[in-house]
Amino acid sequence: MADRQRDPDLADTLLLLEHPPVYTLGRGSSLDFIKFTPPASFTAGVTPSSRAEPTPPQPGPELHRTERGGEVTYHCPGQLVGYPILNLRRLSADLHWYLRQLEEYLIRVLDHYGLRGERI
């Protein structure tokens, strides 16, 4: 990753991997979406909202705040996750254009395997 920052002309890469059980919380997330009590170290400085009764922290998946948009995402073994790593400026400066292209490509791949994909 550091090499890519130094040289944006490196070839595009796709990372495919499985995560251990983990919840990631995007910028739009709230701890109200978590159905278990996170460890105190995770909630330090967070004002509780509508939780009626706090319960003791329970062992469970890891929690990580991220800089992505959206709310809460759960990743676990058996779930294949893909991370395209590329220089969008080389393709188009518009992130939404790229996402529509990626979406169309995945819909076509699904169709090739007899599965129906659609835009939401």
From Swiss-Prot:
This is Octanoyltransferase. Belongs to the LipB family. It comes from the Bacteria. GO terms for cellular component: cytoplasm. NCBIfam families: lipB (TIGR00214). It is found in: Cytoplasm. Residues 8-120 form the BPL/LPL catalytic domain. Its EC number is 2.3.1.181. Substrate binds at residues 68-75. The lineage of its organism: Bacteria, Bacillati, Cyanobacteriota, Cyanophyceae, Prochlorotrichales. Keywords: Acyltransferase, Cytoplasm, Transferase. The keyword Acyltransferase applies. GO terms for molecular function: lipoyl(octanoyl) transferase activity. In the reaction, the free carboxyl group of octanoic acid is attached via an amide linkage to the epsilon-amino group of a specific lysine residue of lipoyl domains of lipoate-dependent enzymes. PROSITE patterns: BPL_LPL_CATALYTIC, LIPB. It holds the Pfam family LplA-B_cat. Catalyzes the transfer of endogenously produced octanoic acid from octanoyl-acyl-carrier-protein onto the lipoyl domains of lipoate-dependent enzymes. Lipoyl-ACP can also act as a substrate although octanoyl-ACP is likely to be the physiological substrate. It comes from Prochlorothrix hollandica. Signal peptide: none annotated. Residues 42-68 are annotated as: Disordered. GO terms for biological process: protein modification process.
